[in-house]
Amino acid sequence: MNHRALAAALLLLPSMLTASAGAEAELSTPETVVDAFHEALGGGDRQAVLDLLAEDVLIFESGGAELSRDEYAHHHLGSDMEFSAATESKVVDRRRGGDEETSWVLTRTETSGTFRDREISARGTETMILSRGESGWKIVHIHWSSR
């Protein structure tokens, strides 16, 4: 047995546990999950986006619907990440309601930037419904609208 490797692992264990606890604490409220979702979209972190969505998430946008996490991953996730990276959104208003198991987060935004050679200046509304399970809060529904 390599005692140096074991000693190094034992020395690193507290920091690994702290990092894990910190990540859990960072996603302890519906609002922090919504913020993490948008941060992952803008940062191009596909796996982080998908990890925050329930498998059976329903996503409504511009009259269209994606009926699962897998469908979203294979259809609009890429372009949503590209749009989020190219633009800047400012939260104008946010409200939350619900209880310990189900919560909703309503957000109004102003978005600006250039996307695919087109100037963007839009007001948006977003409704997210989250459900709390064994693995924490997951997004079960998103409805986006903008003008």
Q: What is each model feature region?
A:
Residues 123-147:
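Short beta-strand edge/turn micro-motifs at domain boundaries
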Residues 58, 74-120:
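Surface-exposed, charged secondary-structure patches
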Residues 1-8:
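Bacterial N-terminal signal peptides that target proteins for export
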Residues 42, 111-115, 130:
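Beta-strand elements of well-folded, non-transmembrane domains
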Residues 38-39, 58-63, 116:
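Second-shell loop/turn segments in exported
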Residues 46-82:
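N-terminal, post-signal-peptide region of Sec/Tat-exported proteins
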Residues 53, 63-64, 107-111, 126, ...:
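A mature extracytoplasmic/lumenal domain signature
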Residues 11-55, 71:
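Short, low-complexity N-terminal intrinsically disordered segments enriched in polar/charged residues
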